């Protein structure tokens, strides 16, 4: 898949604000500060399209980006961030779960996992949830540039042991662009 055009479409705080289900949706989900926004910016080649922050929990809404006029990339709030209040964490969790359960337009879910901390309990729970719902998902191991070759191989093996039903695993670096072409090629199977 080649990305020709990428624009911010809308943010929503409740399922009632979601756009019509006219385009396939590729969903980006992962722990807080795993690099979802950086990955979106890297994939699209549009710096600042998705707002990035070194502060976990920055994304608090469901953010839609229209790609090539006929696909949505959907950035969900991160899970696992402890510094927000219980009520806010419950709201994010309910929004995330309800969206994944009910949205028919979801073509693929990308579970972003920090390569330095593979297979954390919250990531395994997300994969189990997606498998329970029979949602196709791929795993993106982010921050690949921060690992040595030996660490990278060990992290990949560990991730593979927990994700037998993943459609693919891609090691990705938003800094260098490593994995970008591979990931975009996978999208072809889910957006046609």
UniProtKB/Swiss-Prot annotation:
SUPFAM superfamilies: P-loop containing nucleoside triphosphate hydrolases
A Pfam family annotated for this UniProt entry: MMR_HSR1
InterPro entries: G_ENGB_dom, GTP-bd, GTP-bd_ribosome_bio_YsxC, P-loop_NTPase
Residues bound to GTP: 30-37, 57-61, 75-78, 142-145, 172-174
Keyword Metal-binding (UniProt): yes
GO biological process, one term: division septum assembly
MF annotations from Gene Ontology: GTP binding; metal ion binding
Domain EngB-type G, chain residue ranges per copy: 22-192
Cell cycle found in the keyword field: yes
Cited function: Necessary for normal cell division and for the maintenance of normal septation.
Stated family: Belongs to the TRAFAC class TrmE-Era-EngA-EngB-Septin-like GTPase superfamily. EngB GTPase family.
Name of the protein in its database record: Probable GTP-binding protein EngB
UniProt source species: Chlorobium limicola (strain DSM 245 / NBRC 103803 / 6330)
Lineage, top ranks: Bacteria, Pseudomonadati, Chlorobiota, Chlorobiia, Chlorobiales
Gene it is expressed from: engB
